[in-house]
């Protein structure tokens, strides 16, 4: 299922479900203290790059709630990057396959059952533009539901059942925004966690097996043996925008950059996804 179809489903059915669930939330809401945080579910569905930016958030969770078990919910295509970053054990990863409407519905029902079985008490919804993530946070049954909310600003309607609403700040890096979501769990301000948070987490470390390193060295050796890059620095460029081509530079800009790098003595290689091939 392409991105346009996903957006259409999210806009039509997602908006309706968000409004319905908001009515249930109004009837069930009761004031009270923050429940104990024992089981956290982090929802970050579609953005592979956001998982890298979420490193500081997972560091903050581990430091602030060291005895808490953490699970993640993502789209199936991003499972590999989470395994590489090793945020949580593979057994604590819940995955949804959005490749078709049937697999999407089937996996949502399965994940719904899993969430109810695990009994999460806290859900951190890291999405900005998905209604499905806020719906899943409601279906989880968690008492604490943290997520971005426009408050008085214009923004995507994602329901009113996020009971730890965080105001998104476009002037702060998203990695800092993710840490703010963790701080909002026990925040008493309105909006939640308004103060500037400190982010001191080191860059994420990736563990690569010796066999993978050897395989890549062999590929590069084949490239070098052709004499093309002998004695020159190799610069890899990804000129595509993935599922959102609007993010990509114009192709002419990549061409000029490549020409400048070659002029400086570098060897330029082009990388990309299978669907990027002409």
Predicted regions located by residue number:
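Catalytic machinery of carbohydrate-active enzymes
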Residues: 1-278
């Amino acid at each position: 299922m392409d991105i346009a179809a996903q957006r259409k489903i999210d806009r039509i059915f997602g908006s309706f479900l968000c409004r319905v669930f908001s009515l249930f939330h109004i009837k069930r809401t009761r004031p009270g203290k923050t429940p104990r945080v024992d089981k956290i579910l982090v929802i970050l569905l579609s953005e592979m790059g956001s998982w890298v930016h979420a490193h500081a958030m997972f560091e903050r969770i581990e430091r602030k709630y060291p005895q808490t078990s953490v699970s993640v919910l993502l789209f199936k295509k991003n499972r590999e990057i989470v395994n590489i970053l090793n945020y949580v054990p593979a057994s604590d990863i819940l995955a949804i396959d959005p490749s078709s409407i049937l697999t999407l519905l089937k996996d949502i029902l399965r994940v719904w059952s899993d969430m109810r079985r695990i009994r999460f008490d806290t859900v951190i919804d890291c999405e900005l533009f998905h209604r499905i993530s806020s719906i899943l946070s409601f279906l989880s049954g968690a008492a604490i539901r943290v997520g971005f909310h426009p408050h008085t600003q214009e923004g995507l309607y994602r329901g009113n059942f996020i009971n730890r609403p965080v105001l998104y700040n476009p002037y702060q890096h998203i990695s800092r925004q993710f840490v703010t979501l963790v701080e909002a769990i026990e925040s008493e301000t309105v909006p939640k966690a308004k103060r500037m948070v400190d982010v001191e987490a080191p860059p994420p470390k990736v563990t690569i097996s010796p066999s993978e390193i050897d395989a890549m060295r062999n590929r590069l050796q084949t490239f070098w043996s052709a004499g093309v890059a002998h004695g020159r620095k190799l610069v890899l460029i990804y000129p595509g925008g993935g599922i959102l081509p609007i993010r990509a530079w114009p192709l002419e800009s990549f061409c000029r950059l490549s020409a400048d790098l070659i002029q400086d003595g570098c060897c330029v290689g082009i990388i990309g996804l299978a669907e990027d091939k002409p």
